[in-house]
């Protein structure tokens, strides 16, 4: 008889384990609430990501694969539920809009667009058209142009621009091309551009219930980086192309406009005031009359922010707000709070206080509602399991969520998963800093080296998400502490604004306090504490090694080191006297004061510097400055430079082999300085 293969032995979470994870996203609920379409993403056999659309019933049954392409995404239901539109790059073509019967069958290419990028796919309410945002690739950068140059032995041409916004991290170089709004006919696929005046191409839109109009949140100012508060709400007549500005709107940034079912109201996310872009102020929920523009803030009495921005490497941190109507009188929005992300109900008339409809130490992703606003589908993330899809019914007081997928259950069952404990640590001035600790899951009663992880942003949050990197470190025998120092989202406006224009002050006090707290724990080896982080987390790592010798070693990943040079070479250049006082050319004092590079004369901590050649957010010269400063002073340092096809987000969505290499470098560095012989 065959022997049982069941065993109680579980495997540790390793860098290679990322290949076993299934990532889920873009859930779309059918109009009647009976079915769910979603994107299934997994690492493929050719060092790639394979993304398909899957389908399942809302209440029962297993999900099934719905599309066969390897790069399918953005599913959108037709209003009658008979069709599914999606974006695909199949058959070696550039991305196109496809439609397919929702019962299955052959997908039909609805568009024949030139090479470019497609986002924001939405059906018209009458089901005769789909709208989408499209940006055409610059002529010299298309695949065909590249092929012809290669055959002719030509050189890659220079990029010439007169616009300061000509590139975007993770998106590459696009020169002066911008996203524009298009509509396509479902009957014959004919498509046309209906709006193209947003200066940066960052508009949001929604169809009016009558199917003839579209509302756009758009900035047409000639200097949008300098004037982000000039965002308007426009109503576009789709047939004639005529636009009408909704009058009397408060000045400030606006985004994610959503018509009420009766078309009378528009809910949107916004901030008021001139300085309302990269802001520490809360992003609020606003409501306006669609004709008169009379507006009021519905979330002003709370200290919530509509930017949940909870970080993870197994789900995309959403820096965009999510807003939806549930009937004509109730609005749902997602807020981040204390490391969690929840759905909140707001009353249109403002007579009832906002009410949180979901509970638990979880992070809910952007949801999608049925046509009647009574059902919702969303991803649910928690610290001990990767995100899965949940479907729920919405009542006046709560949302009852039911787990509907189990793609990662086997992974959780067969691997040793570290479970975090949550703590509040007192900083030097008494401020409480929320902190989580992961201990090695299979080694109890022993002391272990400790690692401080610092998040990026800085205006984001760590929290109740599954973090593969953290699990790898805990399974390798390290205690991992991750916290939300001042500057983080999720703790109110004042907490977030505490480091506005003054990084390296109270934020460092908080990180230092957490480090000392971890060092004092009975399960940590007192003299073996490390620090690491990416982006702003890399900044704080640099600041730490320039401020103290308490850390055994450090890892500075995709860092910021010099605010003066960063102000001019990032994809979003710093505007003078906005977030930072002064500027980066003739009044750099505040920027220099907050630059860790000026502290490197005191640094003695062995440091691994990780950076990507294609990082357009924090240019690779930021990492170069730290590495050079350390090596010139004979401080042990190692520099890992990833190729140009990687970007600032490599640890989350970079080429799989590069992600594995990065994690191996991290493990080897900690092993070298924690467990090996060092000269220190």
Region spans (language model):
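Beta-strand-rich domains and repeat architectures in extracellular enzymes and scaffolds
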Residues: 16-51, 176
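Conserved beta-propeller blade repeats
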Residues: 21-36, 69-87, 107, 114-130, ...
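Predominantly five- to eight-bladed beta-propeller fold
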Residues: 2-7, 51, 135-187, 227-232, ...
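Short loop/turn segments that connect beta-strands within beta-propeller blades
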Residues: 57-61, 101-105, 185-189, 237-241, ...
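Beta-propeller fold detector
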Residues: 64-67, 108-111, 192-195, 244-247, ...
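Cap/lid segment of the alpha/beta-hydrolase catalytic domain
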Residues: 221-222, 405-527, 534, 566-574, ...
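Short, solvent-exposed loop/turn segments at conserved positions within beta-propeller repeat blades
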Residues: 46-50, 90-95, 141, 172-178, ...
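Active-site-proximal cap/loop segments of hydrolase catalytic domains
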Residues: 482-680
């Amino acid at each position: 008889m065959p022997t049982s293969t069941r065993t109680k032995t579980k495997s540790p979470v390793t860098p290679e384990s990322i290949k076993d994870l299934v990532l889920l996203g873009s859930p779309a609920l059918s109009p009647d609430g009976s079915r769910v379409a979603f994107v299934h993403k997994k690492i493929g056999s050719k060092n790639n990501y394979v993304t398909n659309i899957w389908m399942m019933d809302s209440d029962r049954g297993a999900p099934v694969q719905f599309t066969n392409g390897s790069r399918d995404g953005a599913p959108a239901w037709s209003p009658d539920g008979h069709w599914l539109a999606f974006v695909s790059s199949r058959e070696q073509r550039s991305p196109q809009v496809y439609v397919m019967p929702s019962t299955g069958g052959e997908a039909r290419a609805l568009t024949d667009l030139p090479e470019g990028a497609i986002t924001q796919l939405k059906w018209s309410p009458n089901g005769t058209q789909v709208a989408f945002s499209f940006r055409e690739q610059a002529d010299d950068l298309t695949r065909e142009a590249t092929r012809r140059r290669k055959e002719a032995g030509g050189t890659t041409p220079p990029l010439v621009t007169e616009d300061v916004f000509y590139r975007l991290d993770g998106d590459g170089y696009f020169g002066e091309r911008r996203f524009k709004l298009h509509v396509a006919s479902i009957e014959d696929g004919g498509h046309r551009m209906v709006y193209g005046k947003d200066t940066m191409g960052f508009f949001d839109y929604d169809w009016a219930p009558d199917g003839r109009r579209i509302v756009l949140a758009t900035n047409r100012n000639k200097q949008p980086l300098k004037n982000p508060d000039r965002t308007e709400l426009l109503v576009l007549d789709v047939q004639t192309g005529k636009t009408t500005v909704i009058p009397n709107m408060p000045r400030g940034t606006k985004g994610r406009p959503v018509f009420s079912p009766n078309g009378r109201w528009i809910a949107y996310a916004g901030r008021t005031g001139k300085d309302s872009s990269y802001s520490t102020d809360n992003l609020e929920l606003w409501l306006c009359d669609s004709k008169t523009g009379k507006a009021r803030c519905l979330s002003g009495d709370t200290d919530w922010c509509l930017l949940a921005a909870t970080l993870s490497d197994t789900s995309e941190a959403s820096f965009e707000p999510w807003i939806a109507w549930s009937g004509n009188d109730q609005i749902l929005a997602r807020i981040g709070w204390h490391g969690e992300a929840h759905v909140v109900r707001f009353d249109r008339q403002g007579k009832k206080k906002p009410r949180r409809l979901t509970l638990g130490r979880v992070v809910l992703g952007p949801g999608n509602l049925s046509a009647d606003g009574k059902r919702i589908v969303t991803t649910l993330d928690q610290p001990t399991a990767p995100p899965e899809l949940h479907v729920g019914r919405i009542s006046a007081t709560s949302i009852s969520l039911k787990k509907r997928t189990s793609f990662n259950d086997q992974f959780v069952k067969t691997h040793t998963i570290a479970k975090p404990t949550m703590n509040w640590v007192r900083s030097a001035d008494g401020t409480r800093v929320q902190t989580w600790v992961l201990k090695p899951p299979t080694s109890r009663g022993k002391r272990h080296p400790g690692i401080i992880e610092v998040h990026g942003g800085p205006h984001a949050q760590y929290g109740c998400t599954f973090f593969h990197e953290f699990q790898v470190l805990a399974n390798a025998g390290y205690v991992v502490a991750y916290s939300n120092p001042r500057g983080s989202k999720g703790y109110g406006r004042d907490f977030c604004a505490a480091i506005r224009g003054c990084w390296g002050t109270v934020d460092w006090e908080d990180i230092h306090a957490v480090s000392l707290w971890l060092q004092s724990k009975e399960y940590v080896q007192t003299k073996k504490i490390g620090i690491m982080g990416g982006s702003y987390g890399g900044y704080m790592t640099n600041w730490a090694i320039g401020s103290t010798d308490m850390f055994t070693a450090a890892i500075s990943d995709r860092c910021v080191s010099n605010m003066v040079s960063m102000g001019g070479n990032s994809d979003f250049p710093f505007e003078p006297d906005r977030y930072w006082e002064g500027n980066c050319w003739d009044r750099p004092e505040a920027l220099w004061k907050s630059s860790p590079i000026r502290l490197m004369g005191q640094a003695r901590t062995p440091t691994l510097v990780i950076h990507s050649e294609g990082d357009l957010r924090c240019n690779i010269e930021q990492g170069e400055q730290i590495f050079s400063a350390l090596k010139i002073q004979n401080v042990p340092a190692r520099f890992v430079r990833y190729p140009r096809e990687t970007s600032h987000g490599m640890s989350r969505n970079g080429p799989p082999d590069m992600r594995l290499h990065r994690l191996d470098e991290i493990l080897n560095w900690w092993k070298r300085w924690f467990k090996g012989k060092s000269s220190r």
